Curated annotation (Swiss-Prot):
EC numbers: 4.2.1.1
Binding positions for Zn(2+) per the UniProt entry: H111, H113, H138
Active site positions, chain numbering: H85 (proton donor/acceptor)
Gene name for this UniProt entry: CA6
Alpha-carbonic anhydrase domain sequence ranges: 21-278
UniProt KW Secreted keyword: yes
Highest classification ranks of the organism: Eukaryota, Metazoa, Chordata, Craniata, Vertebrata
A Pfam short name: Carb_anhydrase
Disulfide bond annotation, renumbered to this chain: C42-C224
Cellular component terms per the entry's GO annotation: cytosol; extracellular exosome; extracellular region; extracellular space
Residue positions binding substrate: T220, T221
Catalytic activity: hydrogencarbonate + H(+) = CO2 + H2O
Protein's recorded name: Carbonic anhydrase 6
Predominant location category: secreted
Annotated compartments: Secreted
Length: 308
């Protein structure tokens, strides 16, 4: 009888633990508004994501560009999983990022945030001047001074995230994403795994990897630990509309619903300083000139891809 009671207690405790860990963005008792009740750091003063208001970003010419090694084509097998919230790819420890202060970070995993619910197609976590972009890519790293990610994730200087926005227009297919997107069909349900053979993260990122915004914040999902050095790239990844649609509509969550709008709302800046290593050209050159310059760049980029 005592053994039966013990088993029942363990079952109930396990069910409670599973419920507590099953956070969501917009549904149930553990939606985004209730994260701080179970994960106190989510109610902290240095939370992410934030709105990057360019007129208030401080240009710091002493900030060097990011030095990335191992981001180019790598042979091997790379696990890819539907974790119920997004798609996540495990990355090799040979991928490293050295930042302006000399700290070396080791890549751990990459994942995506997107929109797609009803008429809302934009799903980036960070916004720029209040504008939410279509998708946001996160490459999570840990400080190489620590032996593992598990140790670093609790350290005050433990983590760094490289973020990039995705832009969608009438672009042709971005073939650097073709293999990744084709594998989404293999992980429709939470917990399902597949394997990518060969991976080139550098080609999945924007062409310009040197211009970025940076600030100190947190993980954007529970436990929302405030130990993340953020690097948000200024340039964009370009995907076709079909590719974006497939990413937004291929995976199901733990409630058997399509994963849509898997992003956290922007958090208060709370007197933090956001820096960039490039001047804000929109305001130094004039907004109208910058608008037409951007349009010309888009047309040239489209023609280059069409001719290849």
């Amino acid at each position: 009888m005592r053994a039966l009671v013990l088993l029942l207690s363990l079952f109930l405790l396990g069910g409670q633990a599973q419920h507590v860990s099953d956070w969501t963005y917009s549904e149930g008792a553990l939606d985004e508004a209730h994260w701080p009740q179970h994960y106190p750091a989510c109610g902290g003063q240095r939370q992410s994501p934030i709105n990057l208001q360019r007129t208030k970003v401080r240009y710091n010419p002493s900030l060097k560009g990011l030095n990335m090694t191992g981001y180019e084509t790598q042979a091997g097998e790379f696990p890819m999983v539907n974790n119920g919230h997004t798609v996540q790819i495990s990355l090799p420890s040979t991928m490293r990022m050295t930042v302006a202060d000399g700290t070396v970070y080791i890549a751990q995993q990459m994942h995506f945030h997107w929109g797609g619910a009803s008429s809302e197609i934009s799903g980036s976590e960070h916004t720029v001047d209040g504008i939410r972009h279509v998708i946001e890519i996160h490459i999570v790293h840990y400080n190489s001074k620590y032996k593992s990610y598990d140790i670093a994730q609790d350290a005050p200087d433990g983590l760094a995230v490289l973020a990039a926005f995705v832009e969608v227009k009438n672009y042709p297919e971005n073939t650097y994403y073709s293999n990744f997107i084709s594998h989404l069909a293999n992980i429709k349900y939470p917990g399902q795994r597949t394997t990518l053979t060969g991976l080139d993260v550098q080609d999945m990122l924007p062409r310009n990897l040197q211009h970025y915004y940076t600030y100190h914040g947190s993980l954007t999902t529970p436990p929302c630990t405030e130990n993340v050095h953020w690097f948000v790239l200024a340039d964009f990844v370009k995907l076709s509309r079909t590719q974006v649609w497939k990413l937004e509509n291929s995976l199901l969550d733990h409630r058997n619903k399509t994963i849509h709008n898997d992003y956290r709302r922007t958090q208060p800046l709370n007197h933090r300083v956001v820096e960039s290593n490039f001047p804000n050209q929109e305001y130094t050159l004039g907004s109208e000139f910058q608008f037409y310059l951007h349009k010309i760049e888009e047309i040239l980029d489209y023609l280059r891809r069409a001719l290849n």
